[in-house]
């Protein structure tokens, strides 16, 4: 009986320690996300309140991170792919752009809601481009957008009936934004040996050639990336 009691006590203490360690781990992650998120808000002088939440879901049901209203939630499935602050900032900046845009709906809610539903791809491009500006203004490397999306957004065969652009198109548009507005990060490319950036280069040869031709011949048309 005494041995059984000691065994139960040991299991309870072990469980409590494990729970405490888990809580500490989650708090550390939440603090990191808050620090990066509010740095982006303050550095870009965004005067629209936005809050950030980290969630660990021990469930077989996939939880999608994103912005709902003025709250941005990042689940562990996405957070686990972020290797550094650049990539966390990349995710948060895209969602901050969507969260800030949601404030516009307060004026004419029906019109704004319909626009975002009817033209989701257009808004996605806007969010991606603005995210580049947000992370640069906050002191992060925008190439983190490319590496993070490369790891977390699978490429589909077509986006004809999808509400989202092909990942290859998104990456090409982000790359063009960096190339034309923030070339310093490509000239001094600290991601050049990064496996995920190298994978992007490997899969974006045709799209980067389209950009090269546009700049070479001083064309002013909008590139239709593949």
Listing of model-derived features with the role each one plays in the protein:
Residues 4-16:
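Sec-dependent N-terminal signal peptides
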Residues 20-23, 70-76, 109-115:
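Acidic/histidine-rich, surface-exposed loop or edge segments in extracytoplasmic proteins
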Residues 21-35, 42-64, 71, 79-81, ...:
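C-terminal capping/extension segments of zinc metalloprotease domains
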Residues 69-70, 87, 105-106:
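Short, glycine/charged-enriched secondary-structure capping and boundary segments
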Residues 74, 86-87, 95:
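Membrane-embedded segments
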Residues 90-106:
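Active-site recognition of the HExxH zinc-binding catalytic motif
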Residues 102-124:
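Post-HEXXH active-site segment of zinc metalloproteases
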